Amino acid sequence: LKKPLAAGSNALAYDHKTVLAMNPLTSELSLPGWDSSYTKEGMKELLHRYESVDEEALWKNLTVFLKEVVPVAEQADVKLAIHPDDPPWSMFGLPRIVTNKENLRRLLDIVDSPYNGLTLCTGSLGVNPENDVADMLKTFAGRTPFVHLRNIKITGAQCFEESGHISVKGSLDMYRIVKTLYD
């Protein structure tokens, strides 16, 4: 959150090569949004517990969770809205599954209920140039109770920084995205 931008503000920047060079087991690793209460030993234990978890195992765990939680959400009239993985690619050997249109569809199909929904974060999904965020918004309109409008600027392969919201400041067509929401 300390990357200075030309306008004088600071933003989050992500460089996958930098992350690949980090070792969460030997350094005082901290990334934005991480639970800072983990000690080095706690982080080692956490990563050790996930060593055998691949994408399919994560899908299986998410399926069990959603099948238990969504009926309760329905009874309480609470719409769930999962946030996409940010970034939408593996880090430190940990799988990511809420990453693209196909996986969003798979997630929603686990429990076909309006209470099993998406937080459609334009930045998280938009850092992958293959993701057409406006198309995703249109496709999943009825299952998206929350939209997180965030523009990003792709600065290289798996590298990005947050940017101003208007389209010309970043890599996303924010006008098209907002127009899709409006329509």
Residue positions per predicted region:
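Histidine-acidic metal/acid-base catalytic patches
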Residues: 40-49, 56, 60-79, 89-183
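Active-site-proximal, glycine-rich beta->alpha crossover segments in alpha/beta enzymes
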Residues: 1-63
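Helix-loop segments that flank and shape redox-cofactor active sites
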Residues: 86
